[in-house]
A protein has these predicted regions:
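N-terminal Rossmann-fold NAD(P) dinucleotide-binding loop
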Residues: 56-57
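Short beta-strand "acidic-cap" motif of Rossmann-like dinucleotide-binding folds
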Residues: 70-72
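Glycine-rich Rossmann-fold phosphate-binding loop(s) that bind the pyrophosphate
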Residues: 52-53
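Hydrophobic "lid"/C-terminal helical patch
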Residues: 10, 14, 99, 148, ...
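Gly/Ala-rich phosphate-binding loop of Rossmann-like dinucleotide-binding domains
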Residues: 60, 64, 148-149
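Phosphate-binding beta-alpha-beta segment of Rossmann-like dinucleotide-binding domains, i.e.
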Residues: 1-46, 65
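Rossmann-like adenosine-cofactor binding region
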Residues: 77-171
């Protein structure tokens, strides 16, 4: 249910960086009129979607409208619609260097916890933007702060954090190259009303000994 909203959120924050809207918001707060702001575009940029599940696929379907080049990262690579290529998780460190935008939609497991650490950020393109809309513990928070301070990456859009609410003393709040949102990328109006039909469908499948559409694998944890 949240996939469409999360995908639109992702496209939105990418545009915040490419169209220099984040810069303009920061300048507005300072009442600073910056001449000759040069915008970029998403056209022909490289997008790495780490986690090619429903949310990742939804992001890619929208990214293709901007003619972005898209590679997906998946534990078990398969050909997927709209992706130019899908590679195994073992190749993540290779492809982060290729990407202009790295979007994390991975599930949190023992294998993926803190998969994005300082070493991984240092392998990214120094002009790259990191976006996390999945789980806070996929990222080593202290190490992304270090990477941002050292300009190992250009910026980040973070919707999830190790501790929520994000502590007021976190440096992330004050970084001008960081967009902080409050675990809200998937929140939509009338969410409860929209979940009821899904619940009824799953419940009816369960009572008829059929596999519900929303079942998860408890061993994989997703």
């Amino acid at each position: 249910l949240s996939a469409e909203a999360m995908a639109e959120h992702t496209i939105g924050v990418m545009l915040m960086f490419s169209a220099k809207l984040l810069l303009s918001v920061n300048n507005q707060r300072k009442k600073f009129w910056q001449k000759y702001v040069m915008n970029d575009t998403l056209y022909n940029k490289n997008l790495l979607v780490v986690g090619a599940g429903k949310i990742g696929r939804c992001i890619v379907s929208k990214a293709k409208a901007f003619n972005m080049n898209v590679v997906g990262v998946k534990k078990e690579p398969t050909e997927l619609q709209n992706f130019d290529k899908v590679v195994a998780t073992e190749k993540l460190s290779e492809y982060v260097a290729w990407a202009d935008y790295v979007v994390c939609t991975l599930p949190l497991t023992s294998e993926t916890e803190k998969i994005f650490n300082y070493d991984m950020f240092c392998k990214m393109n120094s002009e790259g933007i990191f976006i996390n809309i999945s789980r806070g513990k996929l990222v080593d928070e202290n190490e992304i702060i270090k990477a941002l301070e050292e300009k190992a990456i250009k910026g980040a859009a973070l919707d999830v954090f190790d501790v929520e609410p994000l502590p007021k003393d976190s440096p992330l709040w004050d970084m001008e190259n960081v967009i902080v949102t409050t675990h809200s990328s998937g929140r939509i109006e009338n969410f409860i009303d929209k979940t009821i039909p899904v619940f009824i469908d799953s419940f009816e499948s369960f009572t008829k000994d059929k596999k519900p559409k929303t079942v998860i694998d408890l061993d994989k944890r997703y």
